[in-house]
Each structure stands twice: as C-alpha cells, then as structure tokens.
C-alpha cells in the first residue's frame, strides 16, 4: 500500500511530538521506539502541565497499564483537553476485562472525549463490548480470527472510533471498511510492552494521516520491522534491540515489498 510508505516519509519529515500518558512498565521502551521511528516522545503526567504540553503536541497517547488515584484524573483531563484542542487521541485499554477498574476507566475515557483510535488485543476490546472471559491479565487468552474481525467492526460502531484489534492477524475498522494486516512476528509476544509500543507508533502516524490509514500505517511499519529483526536475532533480548534498529532502518522500499494488507468492504 503506497500510502503507508508515504506516511512514513511524512512522519520523519516533521518528527511529530507525541504526548504519552503511559505505564511505568513500558515508558522507556516506548520512548525509544518513537525515537527510532523518527518521532519525538514526551511522557508528561502532571495535571498542572497537561494543557500546555498537549497544545504543542501532534497527538495524545493514553495507556491505562498502571492505574492509580493520580493517573486516572490526569488521563481524564488529558482526553478532555485534547478533544477541545482537536488533537488526535489513541487509547490503549491495557488489561480491560481483567478488573472492573481497568474496564470502567477505559469506558469512561471513551465517553469523555473524541477518541480517534482504540487499540487493544482481542480480549481487551471484547471486554469493552461486554464479552467477558477473553482476557488473561493484560494478555488476550483466546483469539478467534473471524470473531476478531467482527469485534473490530462492532467496536468501531459502538464507540464511534477507529477500532484496532491486534493479534496473529490485526484488524482495523472505521465501521464502514476493514483492513486486515498479517505483518509481525510471534517473538513480539516474548518482549514486554510491544503492544503498547504499537499504540504509540499509531499515535505518531496520527500526526500525518486520518485515523484508519494511520492505524494501518503504524501496524504495518511495526510488523515489518519485527519480521526483519527476527531474521537477525532469535532471542528476546537481542530481538528487542534489533527491533529498534529496524524501526530506524525501515524505508519506503521495504514497506512496498513486504506489506501484507487486505482491504475488506463491509
């Protein structure tokens, strides 16, 4: 898909500032992921500076991986500010379905503002739609290909957003059309925070593209980088380092050669 390659070039040209309210576990790796790709990360959580920080940012990433009584109000305020400023927002409902706190927080954030993209695994998005039993901790316990497609479509319509359900095959839907993406590698599941990193990558692409194609661009770019990284390293530690390298090295030519994307009309 030519638009994916073109979007990568646009992203690197402007190096968008991406404001992240993300979790303690992945903060460092997410920042390094964005830097390797060509974006500029900032991780600001204090309520007192959110308005100024979001005003100068190109997109807002909200990740609910480590919630507490301080972070939840910051997330709520950030989503409200970004909505008022018409900044694109991507929400990662980490662990939705595992606890009521996570599920209810994600649903409230979806209700507060105009979330551009909802990105989660099969179990998390299922839980937000009220289908229980598909989340194991923060990981998806059960994956069904056909059901994942339907969940992506249904979540988009339910929450009026682009819904991205990631798994062995990723599905991205705006309620009218769906893209399926087969890029990626199973080694990503052996490194913590790779799903969170993909969310932030989509956030960076939101600076240069509308939500549906930004999501496709982010997932394909990350997936191809993972495939190339595994060709050079078969173990989790060095795979992560190689993943940074390939996010830095990936270019338009490689995307055009290796993108595995199908567009599905609903």
UniProtKB/Swiss-Prot annotation:
CDD domains, alphabetized: THZ_kinase
Taxonomic classification: Archaea, Methanobacteriati, Methanobacteriota, Methanomada group, Methanococci
Listed EC numbers: 2.7.1.50
Gene3D superfamilies: 3.40.1190.20
Keywords: ATP-binding, Kinase, Magnesium, Metal-binding, Nucleotide-binding, Thiamine biosynthesis, Transferase
Similarity-based family: Belongs to the Thz kinase family.
Keyword tRNA processing (UniProt): no
Protein name: Hydroxyethylthiazole kinase
Needed cofactors: Mg(2+)
Gene that encodes it: thiM
Pathway: Cofactor biosynthesis; thiamine diphosphate biosynthesis; 4-methyl-5-(2-phosphoethyl)-thiazole from 5-(2-hydroxyethyl)-4-methylthiazole: step 1/1
SUPFAM superfamilies the UniProt entry points to: Ribokinase-like (SSF53613)
Residues annotated for ATP binding in this entry: 119, 166
Species in which this protein is naturally found: Methanococcus vannielii (strain ATCC 35089 / DSM 1224 / JCM 13029 / OCM 148 / SB)
GO biological process: thiamine biosynthetic process; thiamine diphosphate biosynthetic process
Catalysed reactions, as listed in the record: 5-(2-hydroxyethyl)-4-methylthiazole + ATP = 4-methyl-5-(2-phosphooxyethyl)-thiazole + ADP + H(+)
Cited function: Catalyzes the phosphorylation of the hydroxyl group of 4-methyl-5-beta-hydroxyethylthiazole (THZ).
